[in-house]
Amino acid sequence: MEALRRAHEVALRLLLCRPWASRAAARPKPSASEVLTRHLLQRRLPHWTSFCVPYSAVRNDQFGLSHFNWPVQGANYHVLRTGCFPFIKYHCSKAPWQDLARQNRFFTALKVVNLGIPTLLYGLGSWLFARVTETVHTSYGPITVYFLNKEDEGAMY
């Protein structure tokens, strides 16, 4: 898994950062987990949220995680996460802690079996249609996250 993670990082660095084009690629970036946590806190721990964060804006510290628990200030979220180039897509639902290891393995295997093609198409579709944005304030500065639909604050669905 570690070799796969490193190969993934190199491919993304070449595709997104274009180190030959600018010095901006070398700037420090927040971790994807920090953006996830800060987004949930900014939204005051919503019942659910679904958003995309650009790969180029974060360090991908959650590589290999597809379905997992994410505790934030006493609340727990079930997070469905997938890399859908050029984004990382998150769908978070507030729910009690549950052992999600089996589902995590299943969703990860499904992405591998499909060669990532459906997630790539989803990412390209998100790139075309995600027009609602929000700024998440991190320890490294602001990060823009994208939504396919405007989310109503406090909505259950």
Curated annotation (Swiss-Prot):
Q: Where is the signal peptide?
A: 1-26
What domain of life does the native source organism fall in?
Eukaryota
> What are the protein's UniProt keywords?
Secreted, Signal
Q: Name one Pfam family in it.
A: DUF4528
Q: Where in the cell is it found?
A: Secreted
UniProt cross-references to PANTHER family, sorted A to Z: SIMILAR TO ENSANGP00000021391 (PTHR34651:SF1)
Protein name from the UniProt record: Uncharacterized protein C15orf61
Q: What is the lineage of its organism?
A: Eukaryota, Metazoa, Chordata, Craniata, Vertebrata
**Originating gene:** C15orf61
